[in-house]
Amino acid sequence: MASAMESDSGGGSGGADAQPPLAEVDGGLARVTRQLLLSGDDPAARLRALMPLELGIFGLGDLAQPVLVRDFLNTLTLMSGHAYPAAVLRHHAYYLLRAASFSRRSFGLGHLEAALDVLASSLPPTTASPATDDPLDGSRLIADTRALAAEYRRIIEEGSGEVLAVSGPTATFAFVEELVADTYLARWDAFPREGLSFYAFNAAKTTLGRWLVTVYAETNRYPWAAAGQGQPTAADIKAMAVELVEHSGGRAGGGEGEESGGGGLFHRPESLSSVVASLPLARRRAVEILGVYAEASGGQTPPVAAVPVLAFDAARLRLLEPSGALFYDYVYEALLWDQTYGVPDSVIEAFLAGMAAEMEALAARVQEAAGSRASFSPAAIEQVATVLLSAGLNETVAGDYAMMLASVPRVSRSRWRWLEATAALLESLSGFALHFFRLLPTASPTSRFARVARAAYLRAEAEAKDRRARRTSGPSTPAATAVGVGAVADPWDAVTPLRIFIVPPPAAEYEQVAGDLSSELLRSLLWVRYSRLWQAPAPAPALPCKPPLLPGEQGRRQWTAAVAAVPRTDVEAYCRSLRAGQTARADPAYVRSPFFPAAFIEFQIWPALRRVLSNELPKTRSLAALRWLVSFGSDLALPSPELTRARRPLELIYATVWEIYDGAPPMPGESPQAVGLRPLNLEGEGKAGDAGADGAEDEEGGGPWGLSSHDAVLRIMDAVREVSGIISETISASERAAEAPPLAWPTSLFSLLFTLRYSTTAESLGLATRRFLVSGETLSEDISRLTGAAWRLCSRPLLYDAETGRVQIPLATEEEEEAVVAVKEKSVSSSPRHYSTDLQTLKSVVEGIQDVCRDAAARWALATADTATLRRRLLVPALRESRGIADHPLWAHTSEPLRPDLEELNERVEHALELGYSLTGALRRSVAYRFRDYTFARLFQPPAIDAERAEAIVRRDARPPPVFTPAPRRLPQGGADTPPPLSMDDIMYLGKSICKALVDVLDHHPAAPETTPIKTYTPAMDLNPEQITVTPRSPSVLAAFARTARVQTHHLVPALTDDSPSPVGQTPPPFRILPAKKLAAILLGNGRNASKRRASRDLSPPPHGRWRAVLDSSPFSFSSSDFSDQDEGEGGKADLRGVPGGGGGGEGAYEEERERPSDIDTAARARKVETSCPRRRSPRTTPSPSRRASGGGGGPDRGEAEAHTCPPYLSAAAAASRVRPRTRRGATRRPPRPTAEDE
């Protein structure tokens, strides 16, 4: 919309000189005119014809064509004998300008000027001054609109950050809202206009601290404040990079075995092939430094795969200032992945305590900037944005933190004191920042943004509630309590500050317009539009006084004559004889009777509404009946407080039911292409010129509509309750009050409407849950073979020949292999077997096992977070409405309460998520997860004796140099938990899936080792073969997940269907969401057209034989090829080993879900969401690099995928030139993508 208007707002093409195209731009007004001609004298047909203009929008191009406007007004003139079309004709300038919009096509200010000229020519000639008392006077509206257009043009051309202020009736125009939104968009694009004070830069004690702030500010092109140390120049940036590399870089080695403070800034992480667990944030930091260093030194940037990660030591960790807490993402990432680089726990805990305190202070500053404001405040929004940006938190950083926290298992937060509190504050701040910066670019006092802000606020409330619920039910083990994990409270209120985006509805402007409308029906439809646009209740209608407001003595004589002419009994008989939806013309003799309102309410509104709510009528007839109740006799009936109060909620019921059946009409500021809707085609669904498009159009033919709002069913229930009160008052005042049956409403229509709204959501979420469970079962089966082999590998001492560099791995004897599954007895073998390999191959196997296990744990944690996000996005709004329905006071007047059963689906999804968290925790506690860092850490430590020590021993030096003290022998514990040694199947599996050198180079038939010493250095001292022993973990079986997942997948009937059996002795609820096939049959029976049947297609899971094909396309699946190239053998039957505790529960069952930001997604999942919910807006379909890389299991593309995962670095040349163009959305800028030369 902005680009469309900008195309006409600048240069020589703007203003009145820009001529609109001669061809028809949009068929909206033409179709309405045709429908009006076909309606004749039927008031219900006239209402149906004008409904798109009452509730929707159309393109400005129609108003710029004199022929379309002339035909529309001439058609209204033919019907000017009726009150409703006469009122539209009288206020036609307001009526047409209110629904005109820029967003339907690429319209600009030139089209607006042409439309105003056409409307000015359509006004009747008058000698009165335009400054009349009528606020809806056409001349005044056109003059006000021209002034607004000129003001808009000035604001955009000056670019001073001003916004368009609107009041009066023009504030209700759709295109005026779009002009206002465009000025706010320009304001936020240029934010921040003033320099930011990066206090972390001035407080930094090290070059690294200043570098991190500089990279953040320069990459996002944020202006620096004049005060303080000042903005670094390009030379300063290069000098910092050179100092970091040449004076602080150190050696690219290290690990947990290093001494405190003995390493440099760059280290090689333990996991290199893993995409998520290889510290991508730390690697990005290193790439930024080395990239600028390469440019400064005239070299080439090294490949990303060869770049070490940015690390830390005790000395540097102490020097990191708390004021830059949000710049140290690489530190938090390393700690959450157990990478300490030898830093003592006391230093880590002191660092975390300082960071937690600083984040609490930042949250307090955000709260102070937001203040106690409860409505839209641009000044408060700018203050909060300044606080967040100055602290180093924008949308990109918040997304990085959200992804990091979602990919790390929950139990990883329990290692150090203050780590849980720090992670909770990071999670809360990043979640708030994501909501804030996603709302910021479009923030404006418009109806479209009001709906977006309300939805975001409710979603943030649901997220905060889920976080509190899972935090209170988190781990409370003694170990967790010892480090202060279980006592962490909600860090701060991250929801209330978002109220600065809540836009109050312009009730005063609508009141002013409604007071000047001459038709009660037109006034009621105005408030229906208000309720729909702003999602706010309309004020109570102004009730006319009794007797009816007819002028003077003539009115009283007419009322007395009507009473005398038509007795009450005749009026009641007439109302009984009417057929709702079929009687077109009203008899004035009866309709103008003062007895007509009560009789019409009792004998038509009550029974007709009962038939509609019982779903006895097809959809078209139900809508026709509601439309008839609203419009019948409205032009002839005397003003009546009862009938006015009864018809207002009926209009709302009609509009809302129409929304749910056919979708909501487009609203101001929304484009069908932008929100995933089909383009406007008011000529019907068929081809152009189809004969059926004119006469036989059904209700849904008018429609480019989208989905209805989340509270649509609740709005219908509120309206029915309001009508119930009016009917009760009317009946109690009649003579038949004692004979009247009790007022009770059926629930069939509510059941069907709720089904229409949430059947697709329930089916898609149920299918995603079943896929998630099957993916977990597949992963547990695949990874259990790897973890079982790792557990058996470390269960026996390994013999190492120092001269040949060969390692002898004990193998299970034939008797042991036969007894693996049968019994757990010790099998005595007189001929032990060994498998020989070299030490480097063993290291590769150990590293590969840890990499695969960590990668699987990280990918499964992301899959679990995806499922939790899907639940929160799809199910939480439905649960809010279903709970509101269940507790609605309308059920006091119904035959049986409506009990939506979405709680059952919610319980199933939550149970599946608990299983997912338990699997993540089990993977992290397995032996394989820390196979290199802990179990075989000795292999990667410096040698126990080096060349200098050996030379000292040979020369009999009296003072030999010190040596590293060898690790004590850690022999495995015996007993029932001791596994058998490795089998040949395990060797073959590890060789094919982890390290091919294990089986391709060496002999596959090893012989027993020599019993003689391997090497004799002197006759006096022999060195026996060194035994590499490790401490195995306690075994455990993760069969609980597989069994539960299998039961959930194959034995449970999908929730929310009529096929679900009710418990014995319990009456099934009267309302259940129907399965797709039954829903399709109901929709066909109710006359739903083909374009709407797509929303109810069968989403049931594929047959059992097709699950593999389904899983192959699922982003949640982990195929066996990710871990093995062969079928499972004997070793594959073992469950996940090395997990303390039993089953898949325990501490892992309390894993807390972590939501990933919405823009971190996969294209495959985006396509599936679009397939499951074709009428919903699709999320961003561009997958993040990390998700694309993590989707694959390995192979030749792993290096390339890993290269794309690392974010780009700061270009020193670009920083030096400082001419990089400023991107739009100043508060949501992202770092530039690397060019081909950079890579």
Swiss-Prot record:
Residues 1151-1170 have a biased composition (Basic and acidic residues). Pfam families: Herpes_U30. Residues 1139-1148 have a biased composition (Gly residues). Disulfide bonds: none annotated. Its main location: virion. Keywords: Host cytoplasm, Host Golgi apparatus, Host nucleus, Virion, Virion tegument. Belongs to the herpesviridae inner tegument protein family. This is Inner tegument protein. It comes from Epstein-Barr virus (strain GD1) (HHV-4).
